[in-house]
Amino acid sequence: MRRLAAACAVALAATVTACSSPKPAVSPNPTRYLGVAGVSMAGLRGFERVTGVRPGIVEIYTTFGDPLKSALLTAIIRGGAKPLVQLEPYHISMSAIAAGRYDAYLRRYAAGLSRLTHQVLLSFAPEANGYWYSWGCRSTSASVFVAAWRHVHDIIAHYDRRIIWLWDVNQSFPRSCAITARWPGGGYVDWVGVDGYLWYPYLTFNMVFASTIVNLRVSTGKPVLIAETGVLNMPKAAAQLKSIFAGAKAIPGVIGVVYSNYATAQHDYRLEKDPSALATFRQEARDYATR
């Protein structure tokens, strides 16, 4: 997540209850993916150059209401990667989405997706178990969130049934809300995404992610993508990167890691700022990723 990440993971409080929909099952490629988030096409080329890795997933962020970034998505596809689109409803009422007030927009968006030559991963309203977004659990009820998520899914899926639907949450932490109530249902989700960052030198992959992933795997049965992660330019950054890849390989059902190679006003996750971390990432990513 780009605004806030928690420091430690805790177990989920309850089992997620699956529900059904008319959506047919999608069979995504089971390849282990290495991805990058938050970069322009020029930034993507730079990432490939310094890491020696061609990402299998490229994650972009879009605001609900904005036109589909067709040219960017086409460029990502032509480069051999799957686009992961984070569709974020800033300043939009989730109740209004659920009630159909934005259906015309969703139909235009879906029509654009259907014209692409390759399957896209799509995440709507990520990290709803956090409190920092208007669609999060302190501002939007679980029932409204689920209704909006399903409505977005149903409108878009009518036009493009190739989409891999990613339900993306923040790693559970003491101030987060229970994930369980915001689960849209197994018929609406193909992959589960988990976001989390190793903000402090003592943190490891298992401390941040393990309990959340294990509980989501048990409760949903869906493949898990580490949809955002990163380390800061600190003395233990290289060791933390090793921890990320080792942890992702060790937990069954984790199918990929997306690294946030960008800087925010508060945090800088760019690998090129730390030669030791960059060298470690180059080696670990090559060992991890297959295409």
Predicted regions and their residues:
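Substrate-binding cleft of secreted/luminal carbohydrate-active enzymes
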Residues: 32, 119-126, 227-291
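An active-site-proximal structural segment forming one wall of the substrate-binding cleft
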Residues: 98-121, 143-159, 181, 249
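N-terminal carbohydrate-binding/catalytic regions of secreted carbohydrate-active enzymes
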Residues: 33-116, 236-240, 247-251, 260, ...
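Active-site groove signature of glycoside hydrolases
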Residues: 109-142, 163-169
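Glycoside hydrolase catalytic-domain groove-lining segments
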Residues: 71-86, 191-235
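Aromatic- and acid-rich polysaccharide-binding/catalytic face
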Residues: 54-63, 179-206, 260-262
